[in-house]
Structure formats: structure tokens, C-alpha cells
């Protein structure tokens, strides 16, 4: 295995298809803010590598999810990193619109206090 290729043999099996999936973290290329966590299969990886746009695998739909195809909220990939075990992918992206399907900039818009109280920490993008 090449050191720059993710190890899909170490992936988590997809509940619908059984194919191995690896977690893919999307991070804002300018601010470093974590935008979302999604999953990639080998086909999503290959499409992301060959283009400059983030492509994921939807576990609920059991198919490729080309970020922005329906919402227009695409992610242009600026850099790709793979962790030391080659089982997690980090995409540095230029985000158009909201990364979150609930129309927040980031999927991590909830803060949980030590007592369990939850707070919404940002406004929805119109």
C-alpha cells in the first residue's frame, strides 16, 4: 500500500452495501474550522482525487454524494491529507454556502456544556 492512499481494507462496513467506508473530515481551508464529517468509499475517493470537488458516500442512500449537486453548497478541495494509520481522510476545502444540511456553516453548531445543556452557537445561512 502506498503511504498516500487510504487503507479502505480498514474501513467500517456500510450498513446498506457492506463496502468499506472511511471517515472524511472537511475543514475550511482558510480558517481551519471543522465543517463536517462524512464517509468515503473507494469510488468517492477516486472522484475526489481526480477532480477538485468533494465527493462522499451517503450511508443512508447507499450511493455517491457529490457535495453541492442539489444544494449548490459545493466544496472545492484545496488539500487532502491521510492520517498516520491511513484510515481517516482530511479534506481542506473552500466551502460555498452551508456545509450542514440544516443550513449552518458547520455541522458542529451545537455546544454542549458539562451539565449537558445544549446551545446553538451560530445563525443559519440564508
UniProtKB/Swiss-Prot annotation:
Statement: the UniProt record of this protein carries the keyword Iron: no
Source organism, top-level taxon: Bacteria
Catalytic reaction(s) noted: 1-(5-phospho-beta-D-ribosyl)-5'-AMP + H2O = 1-(5-phospho-beta-D-ribosyl)-5-[(5-phospho-beta-D-ribosylamino)methylideneamino]imidazole-4-carboxamide
Annotated residues for binding of Mg(2+): 83, 85, 87
GO biological process: L-histidine biosynthetic process
Any one Gene Ontology molecular-function term assigned to this protein's record: magnesium ion binding
UniProt binding sites for Zn(2+): 84, 100, 107
Entry keywords, A to Z: Amino-acid biosynthesis, Cytoplasm, Histidine biosynthesis, Hydrolase, Magnesium, Metal-binding, Zinc
Listed EC numbers: 3.5.4.19
InterPro entries found in the cross-reference section: PRA-CH, PRib_AMP_CycHydrolase_dom, PRib_AMP_CycHydrolase_sf
Similarity annotation: Belongs to the PRA-CH family.
Name the record gives this protein: Phosphoribosyl-AMP cyclohydrolase
Species this protein is from: Rhodopirellula baltica (strain DSM 10527 / NCIMB 13988 / SH1)
Gene: hisI
